[in-house]
Amino acid sequence: MLSLLRSNLTDAYCSYTLQLYSFKRRPNETEWNILRSYTRRIWHISGCANPDRWLDSDTLIAICSPPVTDPLFPNLRSLHWKGLKIIPAVHIAVSSLTRLYLEFLQGDVPALKDFLDVVQSQCPNIKHYQIDIPRPHTFDKTICDHIRHQTHLQEFRSHGVIFDAAMILHLSRIPTLARLSLVWIPDEPDWTFSSESAPVFSTLTHMEMGSQLLESVTRLLSLTQLPVVEDLSVTFHACPSEEAFKSHLTTIRHTCSSVSLVTIKIRATLFSRFLSDVLIESGHRLTLGDVRPCMAFVNLRHVHINLQWYVDLTDSDLLALASKWPRMHSLVINDQWGWRTTGGITLQGLLQLLQACRSLSELCIAIRTDSFVNPVHGFETGFLAPPSLALSLADSPIRSVDVSALVDTFKTLGMSAYSFSAWDGISMANIEGAGQHKWDWNWVFGWVSGKYSGPIGGCGSDESSEEDARSVKEESSW
């Protein structure tokens, strides 16, 4: 039978699943009331369990033309609706609805306008709104006109919708808006604001922006003010120039408060083996000078930067960041693209960084494994590692002969409880020697954590070592 809904039902005592099957005829009023005795308890609909994506005509008639006018889900609070051409909106869009997530597939968008009209008239209390719609489409104006009637939003997220200047201005004037995500900023945005009407998001604490080009995001930031934003996340596809990256960070300094910003994430999202040669030819290198504008934000706790650039940061560079942000919780640099360097941070530099930032819970850097062979002067007894840490070593090169020294060092420093990873980035598999590096690191992490036993390096002949070797081989494959 064709399933219509798979919904999570929650009341004071239990959570369970309701499945509503196809109708072969219109239900009468008694049958409808029996059905509503169950559906009135539904607070949340998380989607549609319809493998064929389409509903038969009898079911549509039954749902959209019931014998009574009362809504089918009178107490519905949250709705995530995905991939249907026809939505029985009149019985889903109710005044109790406060959270709405519409996820349309290609070809589904003709149903959008009718649904938005019903939502606009029957759902005055929506506070959390998300719309994902595939491009190309012609519904930008329709959606903008609809959102302008929403004045109580606390969170708004969109993907695939291009907003005009009037829409940006409207969002900035919603007094309750705390979270905003605009993940489809055009390459050449046509926005113009007068000095008297420039958008100021005075209540916004979380802002996410995405575009093909970093310059487009910079353009929007330059036209707005985010005086209390705490979390700023920027995603883009194309590899930015050095000038574009510098301009972006400079714009952030002028747009955001130096005191309120806690998290900054600047991440390229497009990774391809076929782009590697083109991107490497750019020769861009991330240095301390590129990151220095971020140091104006004195309360930063989370810094995530991922670019299709080489990384050229030294021990002293990271310690300079640590001195500025001693309470830093996460520092993630090129966790997907890699550092693309034969060097990296030395063991001494890593330990000094961990000592300076005892609150670190996430760290992604590249290290020089040859430095682990030398004695760790000054840290044998006095080193206090952060209590828990997810340590990613990015694309750090490793020699098989250094595996034993690395295991001994990590164990001596009390890092056995750490979560380790290396060579897991999407774009690292095309680097020469990636498979062997990942293999060797998995041996290191396995022995440090106590997962593997037997001779270090997997050279033993006992049965447990053979099983460990097979396990490492499986984990080393992409």
Language model region names:
Residues M1-W478:
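Leucine-rich repeat
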